[in-house]
């Protein structure tokens, strides 16, 4: 082979690596407001200086403040009763996400504008089922699903959503809005609609006497409470190499990659099975107890929430991958006591592959919530009871994640690796190509051993009208196998 052949090979490797990086950015959510210029505009806009969020000082740190609300106390009577003013030619539209036509409009807007790469090679493929699952949690308010339309054509050109959640930040629990899917049509970025959308959803949330919110972004805004890093686990090497997601390493072969990322044919933990409705009370108690270990976490105050997030998206029919399935939730039932000892779950968010002669969809799974009782004191008796499941919450919460002794930490690491290994088998059998996870929860306990590779994206967590000390997102603790302090999974 002559020098020109070597150069061609090197150029091809560089091209494939850059293409893979583009897809990594999609999966990492780095371009989550459309193009890079639109994201930059939101981050630099003077709008944030007017909002009750911790401000970044000249040194790059936020100004010290006491933990708690930033704004002075208010009531809904203090809130403007009319919607904010839009630029000429646009109008507000409350979106009924249960209406098939309106949910399709949101789907099209998000797919074409929410996340994209520069070459238009990959796009998130939001399904109606995913949007229903994400936006209709118990207690949701249709008024918090806000669109902007062109007055003349009624075309939907912008969207933002909120759902009610109860959130705990260290010792304080309060109602909040989870804000998501802020999207402006890429041709209208110069209209500065994003700040107007944020103000409007804030106004509507405040009218319900809720004054705090949680949200995430791949860009730096004032001011992150914590940051997580994305990791990716290859499940389908031939396809990922073919579409440019995973360049073939020099000296390696597809066959070697297949062997490297192979998984067993069936789960290995005794009692590992799909979650059922009758599991909800036990799962809820176990999950709440587990999440008490983190500095920020969703409270999951009642079983309706648990049933929605882990069962409502299970799809139709039985066996294998179901029609319209969005979430996969599995538990471990003790064969002797019939206690639920573990929960683990993931959700699906595929990406459309544009302009590829063979493949049109990248099936991506994302780690969702999990919990295990191996870190808790054993129950007082072998008989199943809710009291046993709830026992010891305060003592574990006092220790906190990362505060367990070495023996308990090792038990947690071993159990999470076993649970994740079984979940990867389920994902592989369901036809997923890649499995994604952040460094939140205790994910660092298993990422390395389960062959997750680091992405180049980071997800920043934010609280609106709430100041708190920084919370560890685990992005620096992957090799140390140290859990994070973030216990909220944002879609």
Curated annotation (Swiss-Prot):
Reactions it catalyzes: N-terminal glycyl-[protein] + tetradecanoyl-CoA = N-tetradecanoylglycyl-[protein] + CoA + H(+)
Residue numbers spanned by region Disordered: 53-79
Keyword tags: Acyltransferase, Cytoplasm, Transferase
Molecular-function GO terms, alphabetical: glycylpeptide N-tetradecanoyltransferase activity
Superkingdom in the source lineage: Eukaryota
Annotated InterPro entries: Acyl_CoA_acyltransferase, NMT, NMT_C, NMT_CS, NMT_N
UniProt cross-references to PROSITE patterns, sorted A to Z: NMT_1, NMT_2
Enzyme class: transferase
Keyword Acyltransferase: yes
Binding annotation for tetradecanoyl-CoA: 45-48, 182-184, 190-194
E.C. no: 2.3.1.97
Gene Ontology cellular-component terms listed: cytosol
Matches recorded under Gene3D superfamilies: 3.40.630.30
Family of this protein: Belongs to the NMT family.
Subunit structure: Monomer.
Listed PANTHER family: GLYCYLPEPTIDE N-TETRADECANOYLTRANSFERASE, N-MYRISTOYL TRANSFERASE
Protein name: Glycylpeptide N-tetradecanoyltransferase
């Amino acid at each position: 082979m002559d020098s020109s052949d070597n150069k061609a090979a090197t150029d091809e490797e560089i091209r494939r690596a850059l293409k893979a990086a583009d897809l990594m950015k999609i999966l990492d959510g780095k371009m989550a407001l459309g193009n890079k210029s639109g994201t930059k505009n939101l981050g630099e806009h003077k709008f944030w200086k007017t909002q009750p969020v911790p401000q970044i000082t000249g040194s790059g740190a936020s100004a010290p403040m006491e933990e708690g609300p930033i704004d002075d106390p208010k009531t809904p009577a203090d809130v403007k009763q009319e919607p904010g003013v839009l630029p000429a030619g646009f109008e507000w539209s409350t979106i009924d996400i249960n209406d098939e036509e309106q949910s399709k409009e949101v789907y099209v807007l998000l797919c074409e504008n929410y996340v994209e790469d520069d070459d238009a090679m990959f796009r998130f493929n939001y399904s109606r089922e995913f949007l229903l699952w994400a936006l209709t949690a118990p207690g949701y308010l249709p008024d918090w699903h806000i669109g902007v339309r062109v007055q003349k054509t009624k075309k939907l050109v912008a969207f933002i959503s909120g759902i009610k959640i109860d959130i705990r930040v260290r010792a304080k629990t309060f109602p909040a809005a989870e804000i998501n899917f802020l999207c402006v049509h890429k041709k209208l970025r110069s209209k500065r609609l994003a700040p107007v959308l944020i103000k409007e959803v804030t106004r509507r949330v405040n009218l319900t006497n809720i004054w705090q919110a949680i949200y995430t972004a791949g860009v730096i805004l004032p001011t992150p409470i914590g940051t997580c890093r994305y990791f990716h686990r290859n499940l389908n090497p031939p396809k990922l190499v073919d579409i440019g997601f995973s360049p073939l390493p020099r000296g390696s072969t597809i066959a070697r990659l297949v062997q490297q990322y192979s998984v067993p044919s069936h789960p290995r933990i005794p009692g590992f099975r799909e979650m059922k409705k009758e599991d909800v009370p036990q799962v809820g108690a176990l999950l709440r107890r587990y999440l008490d270990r983190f500095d920020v976490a969703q409270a999951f105050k009642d079983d309706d929430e648990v049933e929605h997030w882990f069962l409502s998206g299970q799809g139709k029919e039985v066996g294998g991958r179901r029609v319209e399935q969005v979430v996969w939730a599995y538990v471990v039932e003790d064969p002797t006591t019939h206690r639920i000892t573990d929960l683990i779950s993931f959700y699906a968010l595929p990406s459309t592959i544009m302009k590829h002669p063979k493949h049109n969809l990248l099936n991506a799974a994302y780690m969702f919530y999990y919990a295990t009782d191996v870190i808790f004191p054993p129950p007082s008796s072998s008989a199943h009871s809710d009291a046993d499941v709830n026992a010891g919450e305060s003592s574990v919460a006092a220790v906190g994640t990362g505060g367990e002794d070495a023996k308990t930490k090792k038990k947690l690491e071993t159990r999470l690796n076993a649970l994740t290994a079984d979940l990867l088998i389920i994902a592989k059998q369901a036809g997923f190509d890649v499995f994604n996870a952040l460094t939140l929860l205790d994910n660092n306990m298993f990422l390395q051993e389960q062959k997750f590779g680091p992405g180049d994206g980071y997800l920043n967590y934010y609280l609106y009208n709430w100041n708190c000390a920084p919370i560890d997102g685990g992005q620096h603790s992957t090799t140390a196998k140290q859990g994070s302090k973030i216990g909220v999974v944002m879609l």
